[in-house]
């Protein structure tokens, strides 16, 4: 099965982490899925992804001390595979796993995803639990010196032992039976562990064998640009940054990362800028103080514009059931979503500490887009010259009317190019028709 078939366009969806951390339950997943189906599905949003710790008993019980409990009791089946805890996912009882929840999400016209950690549970190794289809136990395929630096749940696997591949095969056979459409694998993308490179390939092989199209997302970043082709051969998304939050310095730094990764997107293969910290977030972290995103309105538009013109996946992090009207409007701009889904030839024209310019072509709309970003701390006038932007492929905007996406205004460029007055941390996104 061609892995790219399951993600011909950059995925769009929701991930539970930014609000719920390790604590989301089935009722909350269903509520967010129902909201997406009612308000976002028609615009292309489709994935509902449960992030980390859906298998951990007592998750969040000591959140003031630990994000991930040391020596936590993890729920497993007889073959060392993590399964949902029934106290948070009651429909998973009696061995049903995530199948009932996935069926419900599919009934809404959506797709279902889960988060996993690289490797196999340390608890399974300690208990010498069996590996399906082999004579080995979990301790025999695990590398006890290969532990994630920030999460204590798992051991990395030994690529030199064929049974390690069989363990991953058994995982994805289980996920396929559950009806999983998307898997985010953590502690793997930036290849901190010596086995991470090989384990990326093992995950891909397991998906190929499971006879179900499953999007594979690798985390956390920063991904290695030298591994770009390896990611593209084996995964659909790979994080180019560590966790992204609602901070202007992090957003400004994303321009550097996108510059590095421009030209690496193709159907089924997407450099990933991480989740969109919009709306209400942070409700289940240490201090339990949820917050409205710290990004200003202009910064939110800058983020959405950069993600979409670059062609990154869109994964919302908010508690969706409490989205305000302005955030919902931001997430349902059909023109911007078309650019994210269908855009081609995205390239950075220039970048300095104070400004950046990107362009891309959307064949679906037959439009060329020009995004001018003000990265400085004050309102500025920024000029772009025709010879910087127009190419023979895209045609010239000389003499054409330019339409501004965010305001709906029209402008005609001056003889030498385009001038725009842009607020601090803001953006003007122009387009012209190639008809």
Residue ranges and their predicted role:
Residues 1-19, 23-25:
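Mature N-terminal, pre-catalytic/accessory segment of carbohydrate-active enzymes
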Residues 17-19, 53-55, 117-121, 188-190, ...:
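Active-site beta-loop-alpha junctions enriched in small/polar residues
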Residues 37-176, 180-190:
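Aromatic-lined carbohydrate-binding/catalytic grooves of carbohydrate-active enzymes
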Residues 140-146, 158-160, 166, 170, ...:
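Glycan-recognition surfaces
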Residues 413-435:
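C-terminal beta-strand-rich structural cap/linker in extracellular carbohydrate-active enzymes
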């Amino acid at each position: 099965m061609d892995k790219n078939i399951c993600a011909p366009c950059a995925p769009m969806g929701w991930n539970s982490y930014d609000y719920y951390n390790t604590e989301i339950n089935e009722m909350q997943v269903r509520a967010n899925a129902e909201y997406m189906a009612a308000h976002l599905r028609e615009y292309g949003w489709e994935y509902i992804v449960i992030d980390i710790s859906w298998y951990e008993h007592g998750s969040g019980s000591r959140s003031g001390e630990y994000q991930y409990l040391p020596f936590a009791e993890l729920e497993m089946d007889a073959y060392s595979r993590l399964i949902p805890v029934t106290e948070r996912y009651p429909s998973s009882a009696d061995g049903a796993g995530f199948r009932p929840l996935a069926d419900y999400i599919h009934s809404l016209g959506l797709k279902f995803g889960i988060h996993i950690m690289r490797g196999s549970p340390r608890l399974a190794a300690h208990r010498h639990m069996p590996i399906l289809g082999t004579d080995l136990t979990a301790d025999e395929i695990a590398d006890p010196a290969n532990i994630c630096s920030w999460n204590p749940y798992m051991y990395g696997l030994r690529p030199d032992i064929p049974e390690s591949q069989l363990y991953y095969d058994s995982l994805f056979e289980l996920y396929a039976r559950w009806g999983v459409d998307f898997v985010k694998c953590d502690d793997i993308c930036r290849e901190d562990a010596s086995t991470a490179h090989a384990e990326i390939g093992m995950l891909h092989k397991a998906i190929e064998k499971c006879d179900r199209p499953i999007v594979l997302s690798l985390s956390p970043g920063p991904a290695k640009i030298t591994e770009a082709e390896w990611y593209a051969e084996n995964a659909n998304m790979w994080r180019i940054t560590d966790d992204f939050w609602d901070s202007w310095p992090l957003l400004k730094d994303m321009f550097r990362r996108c510059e590095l990764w421009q030209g690496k997107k193709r159907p089924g293969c997407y450099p990933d800028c991480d989740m969109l910290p919009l709306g209400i977030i942070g409700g289940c972290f240490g201090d339990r103080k949820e917050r409205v995103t710290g990004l200003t309105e202009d910064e939110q538009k800058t983020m959405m514009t950069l993600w979409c013109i670059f062609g990154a996946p869109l994964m919302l992090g908010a508690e969706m059931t409490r989205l305000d009207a302005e955030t919902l409007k931001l997430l349902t701009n059909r023109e911007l979503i078309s650019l994210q889904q269908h855009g081609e030839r995205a390239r950075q024209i220039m970048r300095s500490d104070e400004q950046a310019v990107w362009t891309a072509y959307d064949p679906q709309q037959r439009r060329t887009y020009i995004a001018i970003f003000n990265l400085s701390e004050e309102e500025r006038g920024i000029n772009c010259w025709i010879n910087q932007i127009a190419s023979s492929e895209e045609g010239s905007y000389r003499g054409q009317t330019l339409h501004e996406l965010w305001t709906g205004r029209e402008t005609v460029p001056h003889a030498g190019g385009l001038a725009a007055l842009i607020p601090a941390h803001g953006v003007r996104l122009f387009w012209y028709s190639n008809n």
